[in-house]
Amino acid sequence: MLLNPLFAQLGENRHVLVGFSGGLDSTVLLHLLVCLRQQLIPELNIRAIHIHHGLNPQADSWVKHCMQQCDQWKIELKVVRVNIDPRQNGIEAAARTARYQAFSANLAAKEVLLTAQHLDDQCETFLLALKRGSGPAGLSAMAAKMPFAHSQLLRPLLAFSREILENYAQAQQLQWIEDDSNQDDRFDRNFLRLNVLPILNQRWPHFAQATARSAGLCAEQEQLLDELLAENLQQLQGPDRSLSIDGLLQASMAKRAAILRRWLASLGAPMPSQSQLQRLWLEVAMARQDAEPQLMIGTRQVRRFRQHLYLLMPLAEITTNYLPWATVKATPNSSIIPLLPEPLWLPADLGVLRFVSAGGQAVRPATVGEEISVRFGLQGDIKIVGRHHSRQSKKVWQELGIPPWQRERIPLLYFGEQLIAAAGVFVTQAGQANENEPCWHLDWDKQLKLG
């Protein structure tokens, strides 16, 4: 009953990583895979991963149980200890986030991830989404198959109830862990499992199957919207994946909200609440023109610049505004261009600056005795190449179309106290290379990271 559906769901996949807690569900899944390897797919490569959350006094004994079980079934087991930070969304959400981060970090190149959620879990997920006031995306609950990390996540037991899994485990004389925290109904999921679903199932024995059908219909509607809005989203996005506010203004309120959700999802942001979506539009997109509005969605920041919305990753803090680079020393032959300094690693994951033989920004060479440094935070009046007059630094950034959050993170090259260039953006008249004379070429590699 369980083996053939699992065989069908695996398809051509022959390398699997199984989330193995040692509980009933994951024990059944792992046993089924072992049977599959023995009976149908001898080349099936199975690895298991156990996440030690450090939340239960018995956690170490659970690790021992999982190791013994995997040793008996000749399965490689990876045990990963994680740190849980419950401050933002509570223990349940924090544990889940840490768990899936560990899964992602340990998923090998050819592997797919398998987890053991079942029909009752799907029903609980649907009801929790209903309690939160979720729309069709949230009410879609859990997908049986979805992209994950560089691969896929499969939930092959999603159509089967816990009762079916328990009957299978008992028939196969399997041993599993009972987590005592599952009896604590202070947690929402446990409250549903212990106090609500038994009553619903007693009145309506097929309640879980019905909610699963509703979740499937919601998922279909979301997929249809994805297909219908894909072209609109593409048209409204710039090359930098920013989103046109003017384009959004042409859409109805419902369509605009759907496009915003898909834009955020495409960039890896968590699904925003209805309240967050309203704030995004009213407080960021529709803020007065001279404002610099921002809104946090999870750990990401939504900003506005020139009638476009941007979703920013968390930015590492720049803790110093001054970086000494080198002091130019005399060469044996004064007619020879001074030696180029070694590359300079920048703080806050900003990459590396270096002088190269060609390409980059052409600047005059530093003279003997000049100290080369890099600074952050442009101030004062600036006269750049190609402009006849000095301009205030803020005006320069505005004219060049540099968003406010990037301005303080652009390395500024100085020779002595003279500003020579803003890396990748402009060269000042003080830094201009003379025609037909030797010059240096400044290159900023933003992708290269130290370590």
UniProtKB/Swiss-Prot annotation:
Single Gene Ontology BP annotation: tRNA modification
Coiled coil: none
Catalytic activities: cytidine(34) in tRNA(Ile2) + L-lysine + ATP = lysidine(34) in tRNA(Ile2) + AMP + diphosphate + H(+)
Gene3D superfamilies: 1.20.59.20, HUPs (3.40.50.620)
SUPFAM superfamilies assigned to the protein according to its UniProt record, in alphabetical order: Adenine nucleotide alpha hydrolases-like, MesJ substrate recognition domain-like, PheT/TilS domain
Location of this chain's protein in the cell: Cytoplasm
Transmembrane segments: none
Keywords, comma-separated and alphabetical: ATP-binding, Cytoplasm, Ligase, Nucleotide-binding, tRNA processing
GO terms assigned for molecular function: ATP binding; tRNA(Ile)-lysidine synthase activity
Single GO cellular component term: cytoplasm
Entry EC no(s): 6.3.4.19
Amino acids binding ATP: 21-26
Function description: Ligates lysine onto the cytidine present at position 34 of the AUA codon-specific tRNA(Ile) that contains the anticodon CAU, in an ATP-dependent manner. Cytidine is converted to lysidine, thus changing the amino acid specificity of the tRNA from methionine to isoleucine.
Domain notes: The N-terminal region contains the highly conserved SGGXDS motif, predicted to be a P-loop motif involved in ATP binding.
Family: Belongs to the tRNA(Ile)-lysidine synthase family.
Protein name in the entry: tRNA(Ile)-lysidine synthase
Organism: Yersinia pseudotuberculosis serotype O:1b (strain IP 31758)
